[in-house]
């Protein structure tokens, strides 16, 4: 059985001449990038583990120096690579909080169990997330990820129950 990997960042460029790379994090936990930790990089269908030698934040980027990457030429080859961790390596979330990959694909039903569609995307707006629900017919529904609307999320059953506010459909 192959392990399932979750993307936590993307290599977008090099930084300096000593083999550092710029990462755009796709995690809410940039502190997960820790010296001496190993992390997988998926590039052109190949996954390889690297050891984090140094890590720091710079503007909206995380800068990482991998032990195995000696210079800028080697770092160039990592551009476009996805930093990934296994499910077991994910930072545990507090109860009632979910990773985006857990939300996307959930069936959405209203308080009467009427199916509304499937979560296709999560928009991160700053104030609160918004779930984009694809319907089999008609326009997408935008559902704010707030407790007064989202009444229940059941990852095991693959279902989200919502109480629609007037005007959402």
UniProtKB/Swiss-Prot annotation:
GO CC annotation terms, alphabetical: cytoplasm; ribosome
Similarity annotation: Belongs to the RimM family.
Gene3D superfamilies: PRC-barrel domain, RimM
Superkingdom of this protein's organism: Bacteria
One matching Pfam family: RimM
InterPro entries: PRC_barrel-like_sf, PRC_RimM, RimM, RimM_N, RimM_N_sf, Transl_B-barrel_sf
HAMAP family for the chain: Ribosome_mat_RimM
Domain notes: The PRC barrel domain binds ribosomal protein uS19.
Protein's UniProt keywords contain Cytoplasm: yes
NCBIfam families, alphabetized: 16S_RimM
Transmembrane segments: none
Gene: rimM
Function of the molecule: An accessory protein needed during the final step in the assembly of 30S ribosomal subunit, possibly for assembly of the head region. Essential for efficient processing of 16S rRNA. May be needed both before and after RbfA during the maturation of 16S rRNA. It has affinity for free ribosomal 30S subunits but not for 70S ribosomes.
SUPFAM superfamilies on file: PRC-barrel domain, Translation proteins
Keyword line: Chaperone, Cytoplasm, Ribosome biogenesis, rRNA processing
Protein name: Ribosome maturation factor RimM
